[in-house]
C-alpha cells in the first residue's frame, strides 16, 4: 500500500508538471508585441561582483570594453579577494573600468551585499551625476560572463517602453564543447530561456538570472526601503530571483531578450555542480518569504505562475521519491508474480514510465536544435533524453540544500573556476 501511495503521488506530480510544461511550450511559440516609446540616450553600467576571479576576469573585461556601445562603464567589485582580481581590474581600460575594493569584515557577505555596495559607490563617486535614473541601465555580469557583441543594441529597445524595469538576456555555456556535462548545462539554460522565460513574457512573470540581467536604475530605486541603506538586492542566496519578483510586485514589467546572450563557464565536475545547485535550491527555499508579497501585490496570472515556480523545491523533493517508489512497486509486483505463478508485469511497465518521463524530451530537442544547428534534430532529441536523467542532479542538490537550511548554514557556496 505504501509503495502504491508513493508511486501514485509521484505520478500525479509528474502529470501536473507535464501539463505546465506543455502550456509553457505553447505560450513560448507565440510572438509578443513590443510597446515602444521615444528613443533615449542611455548610460549602461556593468557590475561585476568578484571573489577570487583572476582566472576568468580578464577575458570578461576585454569583451565588455570592446562592446560597440557608446556610453558605458564597468565597475569591478572586489569582495576581499585573495588573488590578483584587483590587479586585473586596474590593468583594464581606465576610461571604461573602475574598481571598488571591499575589505573584511564588511566583505564576503554574499553577492547581493557586494552589488548593493557597488550601487552606493556609483552614487557617491558622481559617475551617474546628470543622468535621469530612468536612462541608466545597470547590468549584472558574472566574472566569467562573456556578453555578445550586440547585446546593448538588442536590449536597448526594450527600455523604450517606460514600464519595463528589467530585461534578462539568454545564458549559454562558452565551454559547452568540453564534454557531456557542459553540453547538458548549455541545454538546460537554452530550454529555460527559450521555453519558460519566453512564455513568461506573455504571463508577466519573467524572472531575473544572476548573469546578464539589465535593470533600469529607477526600477532598482523603487525597491529601496525607507530608513535602510542596504540597497535593492537582498541577502538571499538567489538574490536574482528575489529581485525579479519584487520588481513585478512594484508594478514593473520584466522582459526576456532572445536576440542576445551572455556566455558563462559550465561546471565540469559533478560534485561542484551539485554544490552550485544546492545553493540555488536553498535560495529558492528562502524565497518562500515572498509568497505574501506575491499574493498581495502581483496580478493574478503572474502570481499563479510565480507561486508554482516558488513551489518547485517541494515538487523536486517529492518527485525524487519516484525512483524509490517505482522500485518498491516493481518489487511488490515481482513478489505477486511469484505468488500467482504467472508474470504480472505488462508492457505498460515500460511504456507508461517512458511517456511520463520522456515526452518533454522531444520538445526540448526541437528547441535546442534551433540554437545548435550543427547537432541536427536526431542528435538533439537523443541528447534531450540524456538531459532528463541529468535533471536527477536536482534531487541530490535539493536534499543537500534542505539539509543546509535546516542546519542553519547560510554561507555563499562559491563555484570554483577552472
Regions found by a protein language model. Give the residues of each.
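N-terminal membrane-anchoring/stem segments of glycan-assembly enzymes
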Residues: 1-40, 364-365, 394-405
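Membrane-embedded multi-pass helical conduit in multi-pass membrane proteins
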Residues: 38, 309-407
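Cell-envelope/extracellular polymer assembly enzymes that use nucleotide-activated donors
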Residues: 42-45, 73, 242
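Short, acidic, metal-binding catalytic loop of nucleotide-sugar glycosyltransferases
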Residues: 62-71
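A conserved acidic beta->alpha catalytic loop
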Residues: 78-87, 102-107
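Long helical/loop segments within the catalytic core of UDP-sugar-dependent glycosyltransferases
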Residues: 103-104, 108-133, 149-237, 278-289
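The conserved acidic donor/metal-binding loop of glycosyltransferases
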Residues: 142-146, 247
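Catalytic donor-sugar/metal-binding loop of nucleotide-sugar-dependent glycosyltransferases
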Residues: 241-262
